[in-house]
Design a protein with these regions (language model features):
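ATP-dependent carboxylate-amine ligase catalytic core
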Residues: 1-48, 56-80, 92-96, 104
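Short glycine-rich or small-residue beta-strand-to-loop segments that form or flank ligand, phosphate
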Residues: 53-56, 85
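Internal gly/pro-rich beta-alpha loop/helix module
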Residues: 62-169
């Protein structure tokens, strides 16, 4: 739990240091929205220089996707930005509309040489979709096929530009 309010900066720094010593990649999932709460996931990212990968539910949008990305990208200008990925994409054509809606100035290279670009999208797929319920997702222990769903999601991610990034570089 990387909670700056509950645990304090020193504890969060120690947890990140420990995780970095034992892993090639650290993935931190924010709760609610990127800028929601005090401190927010954006506060955590900015405090520790953690690049933000915005995963945006694109299931019911096309051109608006670019506006959402632009807002996330520029709302706090000094926020480290890794790029954007679309979720719940309906088709290849939908994927192209989403990609085309993202403005060139919302992509590019960040200070420090991080390529902050279009990192692809995940199609709607029952093989890895998680059932939702009020106040959250179904927990893994309630899904007899949880590992198969996780494997399907990993395979889908591996086929995206995000999945092609060499974490050893």
């Amino acid at each position: 739990n990387l909670d700056l309010w509950l645990n304090g900066e020193a504890d969060v720094r120690a947890r990140l240091h420990h995780a970095a010593a034992h892993n090639d990649l650290i993935l931190i999932e924010g709760v609610m929205g990127l800028f929601d709460g005090e401190p927010s996931a954006a506060d955590l990212a900015q405090r520790f220089g953690i690049p933000v990968l915005a995963v945006v539910d694109a299931g019911a949008m096309a051109g608006t996707f670019g506006a959402v990305v632009h807002g996330l990208r520029h709302y706090r200008p000094r926020l480290p930005w890794a790029g954007v990925m679309a979720n719940r994409v309906a088709s290849d054509g939908h994927m192209e509309m989403l990609r085309a809606s993202v403005r060139a100035d919302d992509l590019g290279v960040e200070p420090g040489g991080i390529d902050a670009g279009w990192l692809g999208g995940l199609r709607r797929d029952a093989a890895f979709a998680l059932p939702e319920r009020h106040l959250g997702l179904t927990v893994a222990s309630e899904l007899p096929d949880a590992l198969a769903r996780l494997d399907a999601a990993a395979d889908a991610l591996a086929a995206t530009p995000l999945g092609q990034i060499d974490t050893a570089a």
